[in-house]
A protein has these predicted regions:
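Membrane-anchoring alpha-helices and their flanking helix-loop junctions
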Residues: 1-86, 101-162
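Membrane-interface loop-to-helix entry segments
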Residues: 91-103
Length: 162
């Protein structure tokens, strides 16, 4: 059941989202600014009407949906910040939703509009999120203690290999 009296509590917000909304906002602003830069300086784009682009877009979109649904089933929102999930997708990466934002959002937008520059934005987004997620991980260490520290040493942040 939805607990409306705690809905606007900063503690509730931090437990559910933490750096997600500001990070997503920063990522979308970077994508927007990159597209504006391309338009202002008439930077060459690639053709988007080719079948290989459509197939690649579809496959990456399916992968994104797979990750998001697997995340939801690995740790339902009601358990976030209350229970450390180390199974499911969380046994491969610690921040699957942020992985989607960093990689899939940029790549899918690039494929949609034919932007080379958006592909170069991926490492920048990766560094941005790596810095931002430190605060969330400190928060999680405060909740779960040594269990989360051990989890951090065994599972990488965004990419399923160390």
């Amino acid at each position: 059941m939805l607990d409306l009296k705690n809905w606007f509590s900063p503690k509730h917000y931090k437990r559910l989202w933490n750096v997600g909304p500001p990070g997503l906002t920063a990522s979308l602003i970077l994508i927007y600014l990159t597209l504006q830069y391309e338009a202002a300086f008439s930077i060459k784009k690639y053709e988007t009407g080719h079948m290989w682009v459509d197939v690649l877009f579809f496959l990456i979109f399916l992968e994104m949906l797979f990750i998001l649904f697997w995340t939801l089933f690995s740790l339902p929102p009601k358990n976030r910040g209350r229970k450390l999930s180390t199974g499911g997708i969380y046994s491969f990466i610690r921040h699957p939703i942020y992985t989607v934002v960093i990689f899939h959002t940029n790549i899918l937008t690039s494929l949609w509009v034919g932007s080379y520059l958006l592909l170069f934005l991926v490492p920048i987004q990766y560094l941005l999120w790596s810095k931002m997620v430190v605060k969330e991980e400190e928060y999680l260490i405060g909740i779960f203690g040594q269990e989360y520290i051990d989890y951090m040493s065994n599972v990488s942040r965004f990419i399923p290999w160390k």
